[in-house]
Amino acid sequence: MRALVLAHFERAAAQRHGGMNMSDLIKLTPIFHEKIWGGRQLETVFGYDIPEGPIGECWAISAHPNGDCQIAEGPYAGHTLSWLWAEHRELFGNCEGKEFPLLIKILDAKDDLSIQIHPNDEYAAEHENGSLGKTECWYVLDCEPGATIIVGQRAKDRAEAAQMIEEGRWDDMLNVLPIHKGDFFQIDSGTVHAIKTGTLILETQQSSDVTYRLYDYDRPGTDGKLRPLHIEQSLDCIDFDVQAPTDGTVTAPEVDGVTELESNPCYTVDRVRVNGSKTLDQRWPFMCLSVIDGEGTVCGAPVHKGSHLLAPSTVTSIDLEGKMELIVSHL
């Protein structure tokens, strides 16, 4: 996918220009989703104006049909990101791809999420109406003392996994890890996983909303009925060769304030720390920027914790000032 999307971008790169200001960056209006496991931290921690109820997800940068963000200001205000991708591909270096490929979320897990898995691109295309698969990664923004997550499972093959699921041997099957603020986890498609109680996470993922549940704690959904499970699809999708992590400590070096957290065929994700001023080179079809702590300016305009911006390919450098921390992603 990444190679496909980048194919035309490289040929168009010479046409880009620099010297951009804030008006050239794309500010989007986030979309909020109620979840039975959600809380209120998107309001109390980030200051978002969220609906009543248990709000579990902020879709901050998204062109997915289940949450297509509107452009908040500028010449394209009122249009959606999917519209911009379809009608003004020149802003993305004329790169290929049917849909905008990434989705940036913040998740507030007041309660446990279901034990779940996501398909790869091939399985999703065949079984989910041509959808992308879902590879994702998590940066732990905050968590309660003693918080844990699930990443990976111990069954050696489909038959053993099916038996463990049927017998409810979740403690034997699942790889449970303690987490701390600042931890990072890469979750490849085919990996059994779950975010658990008391966790606030920034998620970078493929633009997909396909989730298969193995177990949901026998709890009712918002309609009072048990949410459906997807055992056969989950068994189809488990990658039994995945090596479960032992912890999420970031060990990559920080170079001039930038730490590369992950780079794979779907995305590259960096943590950027600013204490004063810094300039980021923008050499990609687009760049997603999420301020996760502090405040400052981006290209001269004020930003703060919870601000999200999309830099198109026409923006070749991004000036950052202040004291803040960002998660930055690109293809």
Descriptions of predicted regions:
Residues L226-W284:
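Functionally critical, mid-to-C-terminal surface segments that flank or help form catalytic/ligand
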Residues E166, W170-M173, F184-Q186, V192-Q243:
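An exposed, glycine/acidic-rich loop-and-rim segment of catalytic or binding clefts
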Residues V5-A12, R16-K156, D216-A244, V269:
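Transition-metal
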Residues E99, L107-D112, E122, C143-G146, ...:
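Ligand-binding loop in jelly-roll beta-barrel domains
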Residues N175-F185, G300-V315:
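Short acidic-glycine-tyrosine-enriched beta hairpin
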Residues A109-D111, T135-D157, A161, V274-C299:
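Glycine- and acidic-residue-biased ligand/ion/polar-headgroup-sensing regions
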